[in-house]
């Protein structure tokens, strides 16, 4: 991947900040399941990401990169404040988290594994809209719009994932995340399953979407070239 990210606006608001965030998994022993220690998957992570900014998260396998991102999104339990758009979401009930979910999205490494083979592109991309109560007619129009934005022909929306190439499937996964116009998107190795030419295209697309919509990215990768092309700042996680 080549190029560099767009500069972040001087007045860009903070989207997410953490202070000494921890994810510790208990080690239990015996019949009473007594806790005898902890696996410290993430220990004292302090970070901040502003609108239109990308934080690259690098580290070897098992260093806690994805665990950190899932904790920020409140998809796994953690300790320590997580401020999202000025609000501490750490103690929020799932009912109170639900309205915030549309502002936090994720794009996974394997586009084929994350797309249901039994659903059409329209159904896949519109899934979030349906959850948040958008009507069918509006959903189809919004799917057409976002498919165009990610470089796919809206006439393809009635097809199934197996009819697309790996790069096209990743564009579908990106469209699914972006259709809700989120403030924060976690990109979990989104280019690692793609060949070099397609990687460059996907990085260009992600940069373009960020520039247009001032999205904050948490970009997880082990590929430093791609990290440099997309990230404004980088944290390194170690075992």
How would you describe each model-predicted region?
Residues 179-183:
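A short, proline-enriched helix->beta-strand linker immediately N-terminal to the Walker B motif
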Residues 174, 202:
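Hydrophobic anchor residue at the start of the ABC signature
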Residues 227-229:
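A short, surface-exposed alpha-helical micro-motif characterized by mixed small hydrophobic
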């Amino acid at each position: 991947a080549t190029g560099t990210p767009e500069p972040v606006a001087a007045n860009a608001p903070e989207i997410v900040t953490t202070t000494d965030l921890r994810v510790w998994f208990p080690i239990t022993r015996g019949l009473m399941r007594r806790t005898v220690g902890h696996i410290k998957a993430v220990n004292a992570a302090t970070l901040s990401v502003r609108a239109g900014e990308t934080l690259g998260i690098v580290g070897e396998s098992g260093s806690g990169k994805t665990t950190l991102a899932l904790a920020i999104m409140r998809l796994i339990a953690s300790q320590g404040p997580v401020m999202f758009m000025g609000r501490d979401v750490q103690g929020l009930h799932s009912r109170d988290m639900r309205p915030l979910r549309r502002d936090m999205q994720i794009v996974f490494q394997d586009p084929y594994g994350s797309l249901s083979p039994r659903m059409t592109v329209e159904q896949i991309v519109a899934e979030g809209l349906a959850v948040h109560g958008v009507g069918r007619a509006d959903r189809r129009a919004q799917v057409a719009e976002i498919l165009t934005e990610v470089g796919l022909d809206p006439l393809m929306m009635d097809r199934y994932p197996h009819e697309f190439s790996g790069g096209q499937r990743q564009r579908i996964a990106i469209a699914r995340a972006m259709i809700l116009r989120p403030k924060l998107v976690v990109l979990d190795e989104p280019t690692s399953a793609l060949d070099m030419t397609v990687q460059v295209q996907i990085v260009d697309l992600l940069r373009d979407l960020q520039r247009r919509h001032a999205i904050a990215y948490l970009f997880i990768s082990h590929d430093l070239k791609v990290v440099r092309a997309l990230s404004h700042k980088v944290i390194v996680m170690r075992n």
